[in-house]
């Protein structure tokens, strides 16, 4: 099972990207939002992946964050939602918007996605409403260079994200600012330094 790819963005298409990992090109199918976040050819990227295998096909699906992948898994567990429809939904809505739509029963928002009619949108919202709260903490921030950033719990990065949120910054803004601070200061930076630099990034 391939769970994550770290490499160079080699090529992109309407709904796919090729990630070069040590000379091996992996074809990854992605949502429009993921493709936008990946950046330009030659950029270093980190892509979370889900492998789908059927009798006639096997493919890698790519995501900017573990949260987006978690929602993809939930969506494809709903009857009538395959990988194509799930990616269409994730192209139309951010992880935060999808979580909010399911939590509030807003099927009209889900129906904005291509290929999703009112009946299917209602089924998705009804089946995932109770599960939406469990994924409320997931965001899809993207750090410098198009790399998704998820702060591991219990370390200085996670504490810095929490500190910025306590100061009133939105989760995605806080996470992106801390990602930039980590890139500038290094992964061993202390909490105070991370918060100081992240505050400048978030405010600027």
UniProtKB/Swiss-Prot annotation:
GO biological process, one term: DNA repair
Residue segments, region Domain III: 154-204
Region (Domain II), start-end ranges: 65-143
Compartments, record wording: Cytoplasm
Origin superkingdom: Bacteria
Region span, Domain I: 1-64
Leader sequence segment: none
Record carries keyword NADP: no
Family matches, as InterPro entries: DNA_helicase_Holl-junc_RuvA_I, Hlx-hairpin-Hlx_DNA-bd_motif, NA-bd_OB-fold, RuvA, RuvA_2-like, RuvA_C, RuvA_C_sf
GO cellular component: cytoplasm; Holliday junction helicase complex; Holliday junction resolvase complex
Primary location class: cytoplasm
Keywords per UniProt: Cytoplasm, DNA damage, DNA recombination, DNA repair, DNA-binding
Region (Flexible linker): 144-154
Stated role: The RuvA-RuvB-RuvC complex processes Holliday junction (HJ) DNA during genetic recombination and DNA repair, while the RuvA-RuvB complex plays an important role in the rescue of blocked DNA replication forks via replication fork reversal (RFR). RuvA specifically binds to HJ cruciform DNA, conferring on it an open structure. The RuvB hexamer acts as an ATP-dependent pump, pulling dsDNA into and through the RuvAB complex. HJ branch migration allows RuvC to scan DNA until it finds its consensus sequence, where it cleaves and resolves the cruciform DNA.
Subunit structure: Homotetramer. Forms an RuvA(8)-RuvB(12)-Holliday junction (HJ) complex. HJ DNA is sandwiched between 2 RuvA tetramers; dsDNA enters through RuvA and exits via RuvB. An RuvB hexamer assembles on each DNA strand where it exits the tetramer. Each RuvB hexamer is contacted by two RuvA subunits (via domain III) on 2 adjacent RuvB subunits; this complex drives branch migration. In the full resolvosome a probable DNA-RuvA(4)-RuvB(12)-RuvC(2) complex forms which resolves the HJ.
Family to which the UniProt record says this protein belongs: Belongs to the RuvA family.
Domain text: Has three domains with a flexible linker between the domains II and III and assumes an 'L' shape. Domain III is highly mobile and contacts RuvB.
Name the record gives this protein: Holliday junction branch migration complex subunit RuvA
Source species: Novosphingobium aromaticivorans (strain ATCC 700278 / DSM 12444 / CCUG 56034 / CIP 105152 / NBRC 16084 / F199)
Gene name of the encoded protein: ruvA
């Amino acid at each position: 099972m391939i769970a994550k790819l770290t490499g160079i963005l080699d090529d992109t298409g309407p709904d796919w990207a090729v990630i070069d990992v040590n000379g091996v090109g992996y074809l990854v199918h992605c949502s429009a939002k993921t493709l936008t976040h990946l950046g330009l050819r030659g950029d270093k990227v980190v892509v979370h992946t889900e492998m789908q295998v059927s009798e006639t096909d096997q493919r890698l699906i790519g995501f900017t964050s573990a949260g987006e992948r978690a929602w993809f898994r939930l969506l494809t567990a709903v009857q009538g939602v395959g990988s194509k429809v799930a990616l269409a939904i994730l192209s139309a809505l951010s992880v935060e918007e999808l979580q909010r739509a399911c939590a509030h029963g807003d099927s009209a928002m889900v129906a904005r996605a291509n290929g999703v009619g009112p009946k299917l949108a209602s089924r998705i919202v009804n089946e995932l409403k109770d599960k939406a709260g469990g994924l409320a903490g997931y965001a899809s921030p993207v750090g410098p260079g198009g790399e998704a950033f998820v702060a591991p719990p219990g370390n200085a990065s996670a504490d810095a994200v929490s500190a910025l949120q306590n100061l009133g910054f939105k989760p995605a803004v806080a996470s992106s600012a801390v990602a930039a601070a980590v890139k500038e200061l290094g992964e061993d930076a202390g909490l105070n330094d991370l918060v100081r630099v992240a505050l400048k990034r978030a405010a600027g």
